[in-house]
């Protein structure tokens, strides 16, 4: 079975199972977003204290747990680098990581305050759809795999 077909079957099973499986609306046993979440040219790798996000050739960090709560929605602060590949350029900028989790499907937006644009303007990345347990399918830009790599950036 190809990875694409497997991903479709997993997604169909998750959507059919709905919010009553696992930990309620989020489907997460402890209620927190943890583990690897992957999609097309996007990914999120999280533990109970932080998360690292890639959307295309950009990346950012959340320095706290992501807790979607009983409604399955989250909005947490972090930082983001808009020009990250092939060579990181510029400072990390303030960002909001906003989204929802339903079952094992996450919808994510990142709203970055671009402080380098000569006045604070915002750049919105997303929405991207991520599936729990699916490896991110990055195109030309690699994703950081280990916690040490994430923190060293």
Q: Model-found features: residue ranges?
A:
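Short solvent-exposed loop/turn micro-motifs enriched in small/polar/acidic residues
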Residues: 37, 59, 90-92
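N-terminal glycine/threonine-rich, aromatic-flanked beta-hairpin/loop signature
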Residues: 40-82
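Bacterial Sec-dependent N-terminal signal peptides
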Residues: 3, 13-31
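Tryptophan-anchored aromatic micro-motifs
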Residues: 24-45, 51, 76, 108, ...
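Extracellular Ig-like/FN3 beta-sandwich strand-entry sites
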Residues: 103-105
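Edge beta-strand at a domain terminus
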Residues: 20-22, 60-72, 107, 111-153
């Amino acid at each position: 079975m190809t990875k694409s077909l497997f991903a479709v079957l997993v997604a169909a099973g998750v959507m059919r199972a709905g919010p009553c499986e696992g930990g309620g609306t989020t489907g997460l046993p402890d209620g927190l977003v943890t583990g690897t979440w992957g999609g097309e040219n996007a990914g999120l790798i999280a533990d109970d204290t932080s998360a690292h996000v890639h959307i295309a050739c950009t990346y950012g960090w959340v320095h706290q747990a992501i807790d979607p709560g009983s409604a399955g929605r989250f909005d947490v602060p972090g930082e983001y680098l808009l020009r990250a590949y092939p060579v990181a350029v510029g400072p990390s900028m303030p960002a909001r990581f906003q989204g929802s989790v339903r079952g094992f499907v996450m919808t994510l937006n990142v709203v970055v305050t671009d402080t380098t644009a000569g006045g604070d303007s915002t750049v919105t990345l997303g929405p991207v759809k991520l599936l729990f347990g699916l490896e991110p399918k990055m195109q030309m830009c690699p994703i950081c795999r280990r916690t040490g790599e994430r923190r060293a950036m």
